[in-house]
């Protein structure tokens, strides 16, 4: 049965500044570039076998994926559905703002010109369904924290508060199996 590995991009400038990045195209910091290299080395050292790396077109994820691909020798291609959620009016605002936290409780909210969590889930679930239909295939997805939440929710039931609280560190590697078990 196929697997999916998920890697969150390396540290970005707005991660350091504690700002909501969302669909805004913010670059990696030098630390982020180092994290990407270390993650590629970790994937190679662990002997993770994958057919392909799929990555978000936003530069922080694309640069992370390219570094991993260079080190592992795996083919990599852009997958637009892995773009981070557009948080509309909240982009570039403090990540820990109380108003934003309340806004996230409404999964149908498009954040004043952004994208609702339900729309994000639709595109990510469609991608994962396509990958699941290829049972002998394993992919590494390189994307964003918001996308990590949706991927996790595909493989595991979560309450709304668990979903909102779930987070992945920069360049953390998660493993999911289509046999129904998150590892």
Identify the meaning behind each predicted range.
Residues 2, 7, 11-74, 115:
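Active-site-proximal alpha-helix that buttresses catalytic centers in soluble enzyme cores
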Residues 8, 78, 143-144:
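A secondary-structure boundary/capping signal
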Residues 16, 22-24, 78-86, 107, ...:
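Glycine-rich, flexible loop/turn motifs
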Residues 16-19, 65, 88-92, 154:
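Short aromatic-enriched loop/helix-cap "lid" or pocket-rim segments at secondary-structure transitions
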Residues 25, 58, 83, 144-145:
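Short beta->alpha junction loops/turns
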Residues 55-56, 122, 142-143:
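Short beta-strand scaffold positions
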Residues 68-125:
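Phosphate-handling substructures
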Residues 70, 125-182:
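Active-site-adjacent alpha-helix immediately C-terminal to a catalytic or transition-state-stabilizing loop
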């Amino acid at each position: 049965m196929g697997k999916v590995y998920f890697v969150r991009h390396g540290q970005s400038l707005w991660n350091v500044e504690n700002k909501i990045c969302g669909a805004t195209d913010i670059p990696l910091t030098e630390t982020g570039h180092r994290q990407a290299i270390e993650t590629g080395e970790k994937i190679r050292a662990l002997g993770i076998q994958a057919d392909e790396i799929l990555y978000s077109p936003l530069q922080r994820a694309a640069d992370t994926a390219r570094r991993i691909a260079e080190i592992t020798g795996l083919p990599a291609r852009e997958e637009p559905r892995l773009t981070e959620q557009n948080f509309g009016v909240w982009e570039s605002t403090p990540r820990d703002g109380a108003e934003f936290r309340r806004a996230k409780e409404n999964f149908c909210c498009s954040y004043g010109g952004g994208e609702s969590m339900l729309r994000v889930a639709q595109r990510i679930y469609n991608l994962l369904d396509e990958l699941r239909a290829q049972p002998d295939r394993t992919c590494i997805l390189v994307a964003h924290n918001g996308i990590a939440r949706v991927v996790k929710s595909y493989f595991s039931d979560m309450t709304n508060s668990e979903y909102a609280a779930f987070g992945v560190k920069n360049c953390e590697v998660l493993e999911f199996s289509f046999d129904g078990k998150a590892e």
